[in-house]
UniProtKB/Swiss-Prot annotation:
This is tRNA-2-methylthio-N(6)-dimethylallyladenosine synthase. [4Fe-4S] cluster 2 binds at residues 157, 161, 164. The keyword RNA-binding does not apply. Its cofactor is [4Fe-4S] cluster. One of its GO terms (molecular function) is N6-isopentenyladenosine methylthiotransferase activity. The gene is miaB. Residues 3-120 form the MTTase N-terminal domain. It comes from Escherichia coli O81 (strain ED1a). One of its GO terms (cellular component) is cytosol. Transmembrane segments: none annotated. Its EC number is 2.8.4.3. Keywords: 4Fe-4S, Cytoplasm, Iron, Iron-sulfur, Metal-binding, S-adenosyl-L-methionine, Transferase, tRNA processing. [4Fe-4S] cluster 1 binds at residues 12, 49, 83.
Amino acid sequence: MTKKLHIKTWGCQMNEYDSSKMADLLDATHGYQLTDVAEEADVLLLNTCSIREKAQEKVFHQLGRWKLLKEKNPDLIIGVGGCVASQEGEHIRQRAHYVDIIFGPQTLHRLPEMINSVRGDRSPVVDISFPEIEKFDRLPEPRAEGPTAFVSIMEGCNKYCTYCVVPYTRGEEVSRPSDDILFEIAQLAAQGVREVNLLGQNVNAWRGENYDGTTGTFADLLRLVAAIDGIDRIRFTTSHPIEFTDDIIEVYRDTPELVSFLHLPVQSGSDRILNLMGRTHTALEYKAIIRKLRAARPDIQISSDFIVGFPGETTEDFEKTMKLIADVNFDMSYSFIFSARPGTPAADMVDDVPEEEKKQRLYILQERINQQAMAWSRRMLGTTQRILVEGTSRKSIMELSGRTENNRVVNFEGTPDMIGKFVDVEITDVYPNSLRGKVVRTEDEMGLRVAETPESVIARTRKENDLGVGYYQP
């Protein structure tokens, strides 16, 4: 009888990536097949996020539902992973004694052993350590699930912004070696992936070891990824302004595979608030980066993160944020009301902004961003945009859907053989959350592919030394 696994995931794209790796790993080691129905599962895993308010209570609410399933099936294994698990550790079992496994983002690769241990003597397992980059060495080979794929290139963050729990829950920055990353991407390209999204909590801080022992920069890595045949688009998230160096901007100037869209969090337009947040940059320095980026890539569109109602934020501080939004002309944002995260310096600050004022500021900010986003979309009306076709439209199975370089969803009429390929689409209609278009050119008319296949890239780039150890050969 097939054993089944159910994973519930909250939070960032890194968590989504981690959950996919858990599924692949437990399929490879135990033959677990994913199910969307928790009641069918032999193992339930909750991959948590601690960024937002009441994250812990959300976890225990979900666990309460799963407790009922365990009462019906005592052999059911329940595991809690992610950032709340890393933050709370053994405290989770104090409130939910029926949880069998507690693991952190850096120990998910040990899940097979943890499950075996629980199956053996029913003793609970708690492992929330930070074993450097070990987890990537233990994960199975990547498996493509469409024309786009996420690839984690580094973990953790050293910035210690006063409001953020990431350094405490995912550890400090650790970068994967460049040859490991490139080999994974080449494998994905061989399976039909056309676009990769490089992931990291502070992705542009990547400083990975090269095959010859030297240390590569993020700009170096972007150029190497762009050289892999079959990879026609590169995205990355999330970056930090303090690490956004001129050599990265030069890649935007020289490398068409890097898309004309960037998510670069700023959080506030007030230098005083930025200082309280521990951001280590000013609003002017942020705008200087954007100015240089647009000089290198005039059509680039920028999204960002904002926190409103940070302790001590005055009306004047908020107005400076609104001015920055207008000056940069952001295309979209992830914006939130400040909520203190336990264990962070900001949790000890006086939360002196009234709740109603926070809500009003958030509404004003989001309305302005929405207006700017619609203005950007209207400029695209009548233009021809290159779309990577990801599948059928959510609105109609009779239509296809894909994304532009600047991350706009476009729905259009097409044929199934277009899925996984590029098409050029003329934009005919603009809506708040999507665009509509008609196909004017198929990939066969573009000449994108080169004669060399992704398989030959793997063969060319993966060499072995005298001991049989693989390394990357550019």
